[in-house]
């Protein structure tokens, strides 16, 4: 079983596993089950992200001042209870950063809701302050999302861009998620084959 969440979190990967276990509990015959719980540091994954960034940079006519790596947030209390998600996100960003010597990459967390504190820094608040810090040309990647969805297409590409430009930013581009790219398919094939 390969949950398509590169960075393990109890709220995502473990929830998928729980549902699979509930289904298996109803079966008289139990198949062998192998779980690939995370792949945040898999070299093919990092390479795929790097390639997607390079592709986007080749398409634009400006140099990014900064790359934002925006991950889905989780409540801070989950991290305080030992959920490793925060660490996995920072590890992925560090490994991607090692591929670039001339562009800073910063981790942020998006999609929070409710009154409780979530992992920080918040992506939306970061977009608002970057232009004041001289970072007026940014690329955004969402390495925690295997495919584009409302959180990337609406929250980042539309709302995030509007907020950034309104705050004084000049250029904003989101790098598409890996989606059905050849690099992503090769990565998934490798992960499954390696774990058979």
Label each PLM-derived region with a short phrase.
Residues 2-196:
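Extended amphipathic ligand-handling, pore-lining, and cofactor/metal-binding catalytic surfaces
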